[in-house]
């Protein structure tokens, strides 16, 4: 895992969700949030706008596409937000925080920002319980974990800042993620998708 894109919950329309946040199967209409992601991708790193909403190539390049909530009732966005999925997704994020390699977390929307901030705070607190070489290794691993937060790419919020969160559009998440990875000696992520 080189980057984690954390969204809110799966698409709630029939045949849209495919297990990767923001992704839809080939041949499906590209949802508005994903259209905004593609708009930012083109503006940020100059990638051609993809013809498909399938983000599988990103997953193959080390991008974990995860939602804070993993299920949803049909036609009812965020309907399963209180079912406890955050315990599992928090565990996954915490494991990524402990990984030895650099990881950039792209937190899109307040629920994603809150979950990642909590996981990072717990990881920092856990350092105090370690000693010697184990603490040094964990501290070094945590030092190369980065959070890029913005509003959600939904048309309802993509172009507006919300408190301390910058607007998604114009936040340059793709180039900034690559800059952070490069600063840690890692290869940048190829964010391109088939046009």
Positions of PLM-derived features:
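C-terminal capping/extension of enzyme domains
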Residues: 30-33, 40-46, 70-101, 111-195
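Active-site cradle of extracellular carbohydrate-active enzymes
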Residues: 54-58
């Amino acid at each position: 895992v080189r980057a984690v894109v954390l969204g809110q919950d799966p698409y709630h329309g029939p045949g849209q969700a495919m297990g990767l946040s923001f992704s839809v199967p080939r041949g499906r209409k590209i949802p508005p949030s994903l259209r905004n992601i593609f708009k930012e991708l083109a503006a940020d790193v100059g990638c051609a706008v993809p013809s498909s909403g399938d983000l599988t190539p990103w997953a193959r390049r080390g991008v974990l596409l995860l939602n804070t909530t993993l299920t949803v009732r049909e036609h009812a966005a965020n309907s399963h937000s209180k079912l406890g999925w955050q315990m599992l997704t928090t565990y996954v994020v915490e494991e990524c925080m402990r990984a030895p390699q650099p990881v950039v977390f792209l937190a899109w929307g307040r629920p994603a920002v809150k979950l990642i901030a909590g996981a990072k705070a717990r990881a920092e607190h856990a350092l105090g319980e370690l000693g010697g070489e184990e603490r040094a290794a964990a501290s070094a691993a945590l030092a190369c974990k980065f959070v890029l937060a913005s509003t959600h790419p939904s048309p309802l919020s993509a172009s507006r800042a919300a408190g301390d969160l910058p607007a998604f559009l114009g936040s340059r998440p793709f180039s900034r993620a690559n800059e952070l990875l490069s600063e840690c000696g890692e290869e940048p992520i190829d964010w391109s998708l088939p046009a």
